[in-house]
Amino acid sequence: MKQRALWSAVLIAVLAMSGCGSASGPKEADKGSNGGKLVVWDWKSGDATAASYIKKAKADFAKSHPDTTVEFVAQPFEQYYTLLGAAIQAGKGPDVMLFNGGGQIRDRVDSLVAIDEYIAGDKQRLAGWDAFGKAGKTYAAPVTLQGHPIYYNKALYKKAGLNPDSPPRTWTEFLANCAAIAKAGAKCFGQGNKEGIGIQFFMSGLGSGILTPKEYDDWIAGKRDWQAPGVKRLFQLWKEVSDAGLNTDGANSTAMFNDAFAQFQSGKAAHMIGLMSDIGHWKDFNEFLKPENVGVMIAPVVTDGATPSLPYDGGIGYAVAKWTKDPKLAADLVRSLTSTDALASFYADAGAIASDTTIDVSTAGPAVATIVADLKSGKPALHVALSSKTIDLMGRLSQQLISGSVTVDEALKQLAASDKPA
C-alpha cells in the first residue's frame, strides 16, 4: 500500500511538473483535444534551429484547418519519457507527441493510434518507417533519419602522417592508425558513457564490421543469440578498447551529450561514432573542424565475412495519442510536420537528414555526400531493435564492463534474460 501511495504521489507531482513553465500541462492538453486545439509535446520545438520548421508545419496545417489552434510544449529531453509515461498512466496528455524510433515507441503503442489509414500518401516520399512500427502497424511518421556514422578528423590524420582520404578498412589497420594518432597527441575515440549511451553508439556504429551478415539479420529480425560469436566479440571489443586506453579519459563520467562530442570537435579525439541528425552530427562538426576536415567512414572489418554498412533508421517521429478526440485531425498535423517544405527547413537550419527523400542535399559538403551515398546499402541500427528495458540494462552493464565489475559472459547472460519476450 505504501508503494502504491508513493507512486500516486509521484505521478501527481510529475503531471504537475509537466505544466510548469509552459502554457500547457496534461489537463490543458486534454481540453485541447476537442478539435479547437491540438497540443504537441516534444523536445525540439523550443530549439532555435527548429523555429522555421515548426512555423512552416503550422502554416501548412492552417491551410486545411484554419480554426484549429496548435500549441507546442517543449519538454526537457532528460525528463521527456518520464513525463510522457506519467501522462500515459493518467490516460490524458498531448494529442500529438514526439518519439525516438525503436524501443521507446514500440513499448508504448498501446497508448497510440495506428496511423496507416491517414498517411498512405506519404509512404513513398518518406523513409524510415520501420522504426515506428510494430506488428505490421505504423504509429508515427518519421521526421528525420538517424544513424551512427563514424566521423574522423582529417586534420589529425594528416598530423599523424596518415592518408586522410583513405580511412582504415580492417580493425588491424584501424589499430595501427590509432597508434599513430596517439603519437600525435590525440585519443582514438571520443567517448561518453555517463548515461550508458556510449555502448549504443559503439554497438551500432561498429556492429556491421563485427557480426556476420546472418548474425546481423537475425538480430534485427528479433532472433537474437546473445552467445553468437559476433555478439560476444562486440562486447569484448567494447572492453578491450577501454582497457587499451583508446577512448578519451573518464568515459563513464563523461556525458555523450555534449561533452564527448566536444572532445572530438576540439581535436582531442580522432574518431567519433556520432549521429546523422539533430546533434553530434556533420553540421556541428563542420562548424568546429571545417567541412574539408570532417571525414565519414563505415565500420572496419573485425570478423572475416562481415559486410560493413551504415546503420540507420527513422530517427524521430510524431505520433497520435489514443485519447485524442479527433485522430484524423491530429494525424493531419503529423502530416504537416512531415511536409516537404517544413522538413527542408529542418534540414537547412538544424542539419537533420530529413526523412523526405526528395530534399536536395547536394550542397551540404563531403560528409553529407558520403552519408547519403551510404544510405542505399545501409541497414537498421542494432541497438534500435532492442526494447527500452534491455537498452537501459545494457547501459548499466557497459559501465560495469569498463570498470571491471562484471565480465562479458556475465553481462551477456543478463542481457539474454532481459531480451526474452514477456
Predicted regions and their residues:
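Extracytoplasmic/periplasmic substrate-recognition and gating elements
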Residues: K63, A160, D243-N247, F285-D349, ...
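Hinge/lid segment of periplasmic solute-binding proteins
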Residues: N100-P149, L175, G295
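Extracytoplasmic "Venus flytrap"/periplasmic binding protein-like
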Residues: A59-L126, K159-G161, S166, A262, ...
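Short, well-ordered beta-strand elements
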Residues: S33-G46, T68-V73, D95-V96, Y139, ...
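Extracytoplasmic/periplasmic solute-binding protein
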Residues: Y139-V143, H148, E173-R224
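Short, low-complexity disordered leader/linker segments with a strong preference
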Residues: M1-V39, K63, I119, T358, ...
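C-terminal capping/gating helix-and-loop segments adjacent to ligand/active sites or protein-protein/ligand interfaces
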Residues: D349-I353, T357-T358, A367-D419
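Glycine-centered hinge/linker elements that transmit conformational signals in sensory
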Residues: A176-C178, I220-N252
